[in-house]
Amino acid sequence: MRLTNEQREQVITLRRKHSLSEVASLAGLSLGSVKSIISRSGLFTDNPRHRAMFTLPPLQSSGETLPAVPELPPQEVVTGDKEIDALLWLRQVIGTGDPVRIAQAKEAAGRITTPSDELEKRYGKWLVGKGGHVLAGLGSIGFANLDGLAKRSIERRANEAEAIGRFGDALWDDTQAEAFCLESLRGLETETWDYPPELVAERFKAHPELMPHTLSDCLHELAYWDDLYRLRRACSKDYDTHQEVWSRDQFIFTVMLAELRPRNRDEARATLRHLLDSERRDWKEVDRILDNLIG
């Protein structure tokens, strides 16, 4: 029997919400015919054009060099408390991200015998006196935790090196993926800070060649946006992403993770693991994603 284009489209539409056997039953076709249509469509395997667009450039060993470690900051009298001022200076040294200086700073901090909680109380009291209100004292939380600061500083330095190794002088230029988002949503007006989700979905779905075909594609793109933000943020605390990029990221998370059926248990498990690790796990849209994974 020769299949019509309408039958093929019906099979593809049904497959997005049903198993292969259910599609065969609903479409009145043999399981073999359904599998053939799905395979030939290419819509249920990873989209190579999508992957190419949403992939960071490779690390270049011969790329730009990391900015030199800043000179040691001068030791200054800030609070008048010698131990507190010493810690403030050591925190600046650790903030350079240089492993050698960090090790030296932590060694020097070990010679301060006052308990860390006492140091934080004294620093908090000074902050309150300077700021004129109790909330100012919150700035002392974790003040004496040099190990945590050292870990963050080393991670930031590593991210800076990766950012320069991948992008060089083009770090702040819009990537192809960002340019695509800007162009796709050009002319849309925001409503209460965000673009209307329905119109965002319509605009992006108008470019099927750059749509994710699988949940794995979705996870790949979400990781791309996370990594791009991580690398740029390490180089500038003032960096923030385009509103259009944020809308694309939301669209992939809230819409596509809920629409694209998992191809197998491994893909469903990977998506669930992403949800559990995500800061968005409490969003109301997560229920639809869970229904998609276990439905």
Task: Describe the residue ranges of each PLM region.
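Short amphipathic alpha-helical coiled-coil/interface segments
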Residues: L222, Q243-L257
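Short alpha-helical "recognition helix" segments of helix-turn-helix
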Residues: E22-S25
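Short, solvent-exposed alpha-helical "recognition" segments
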Residues: R2, L20, K35-F54
